[in-house]
Each structure stands twice: as structure tokens, then as C-alpha cells.
């Protein structure tokens, strides 16, 4: 009986890897620590029945941001998206994209969400502001400090994908 359970568990793990094409799809990023961290977050989302669409089309080697800070940025954005989707229940999709437009690398994370007004989402980067309750509101201000330190920029907004609204945070760094 335990052998059959082991085989079933291995099959489920292999299906999980195949489903996300991991780590193969992430290898384009060329930063092993960042790859491992993103993979962990994708597995966490999968465990919560959250669907993630990943559009990873470039290396992160061309930006001068140390791995630890990329992990902080991407981890925070994914944590926020996963938390928001898990709490709301009716939304179940997250998108992550890492792209190169020739001048900048864009790291973008969004989750399915009702539209958020500009006057509110600009407050997300203020220390202590949170829609999640007390003792929160430190992650995005920290992300902003990192982005500023490495001369990047942040854009936030509502974007439509396949007729669904997503709240998206995009971080840009010069190549």
C-alpha cells in the first residue's frame, strides 16, 4: 500500500513540474537563487489552487541588482498577489512576466482583482498603509526603497487580460 502511495505522490509531483514546465521555463532567467525562489512561490500558489500564467522571456543577468534584492522584490509581489487571491476566493489567477524591451527589464506581477482607483493604489507604497489590516503595509514600501536604490521605477495599475481585470505592479530596471 505504501509503495502505491509513493508512486502516486511521485506522479503528482511530476505532473506539477510538467504543468509549470519547471524548472525549464524559469532557466531563461539565469539567476539560480531567483529561479529557486520563484519556483517555491509557484508551488505555494498551486497548493492553494491558484492558477499562475508565467511569461518569462529574458535573462535577469543584464540588470545590476543583486539576487537578494530581486528575491525580495519578486517574493513580495508574488506574496501579495497570492495573499490577495487566497483571501478573496472568487479570483484565482495571477500573472508574472519578466521581459526585456531592449532598454529596460520589466518584472511584472498581477492578480485578478476588481478595479482599484488611482488614489488608492498610489498609497500602497506608503509605510503602514494596507488593505489587509493592522501591522501590515511594510512590503511595498520596502520594495520601493530597493527599486529606488537601484535607480529603477515602478508602475501600477489595472490591466485587462482576456476580459478580466488585473491589478498589476511593474518594476523596471535599466539594462
Predicted regions and their residues:
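Conserved glycine-rich
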Residues: 87, 152-153
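A short, flexible helix-to-loop-to-beta junction within the catalytic ATP-binding CA
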Residues: 45, 81-90
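Detector for a conserved hydrophobic position within an alpha-helical segment of the HATPase_c
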Residues: 147-151
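Short beta-to-alpha transition helix within the HATPase_c
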Residues: 12, 27-48
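Short beta-strand/loop element within the Bergerat-fold HATPase_c
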Residues: 91-103
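Glycine-rich/acidic phosphate-handling loop/turn and adjacent ATP-lid/helix
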Residues: 105-135
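Conserved short strand/loop->alpha-helix "switch" segment adjacent to the catalytic nucleotide/phosphoryl-transfer site
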Residues: 26, 52-73
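Glycine-rich phosphate-binding loop
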Residues: 133-146
Amino acid at each position: 500500500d505504501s509503495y502505491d502511495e509513493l508512486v502516486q505522490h511521485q506522479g503528482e509531483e511530476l505532473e506539477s513540474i510538467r504543468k509549470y514546465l519547471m524548472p525549464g521555463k524559469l532557466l531563461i532567467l539565469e539567476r539560480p537563487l531567483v529561479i529557486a525562489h520563484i519556483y517555491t512561490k509557484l508551488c505555494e500558489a498551486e497548493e492553494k489552487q491558484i492558477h499562475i500564467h508565467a511569461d518569462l522571456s529574458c535573462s535577469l543577468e543584464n540588470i545590476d541588482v543583486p539576487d537578494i534584492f530581486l528575491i525580495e522584490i519578486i517574493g513580495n509581489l508574488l506574496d501579495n498577489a497570492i495573499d490577495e487571491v487566497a483571501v478573496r476566493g472568487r479570483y484565482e489567477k495571477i500573472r508574472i512576466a519578466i521581459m526585456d524591451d531592449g532598454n529596460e527589464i520589466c518584472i511584472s506581477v498581477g492578480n485578478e482583482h476588481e478595479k482599484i482607483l488611482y488614489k488608492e493604489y498610489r498609497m500602497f507604497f506608503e509605510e503602514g498603509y494596507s488593505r489587509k489590516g493592522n501591522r501590515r503595509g511594510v512590503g511595498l514600501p520596502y520594495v520601493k526603497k530597493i527599486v529606488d536604490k537601484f535607480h529603477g521605477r515602478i508602475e501600477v495599475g489595472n490591466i485587462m487580460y482576456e476580459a478580466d481585470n488585473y491589478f498589476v505592479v511593474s518594476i523596471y530596471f535599466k539594462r
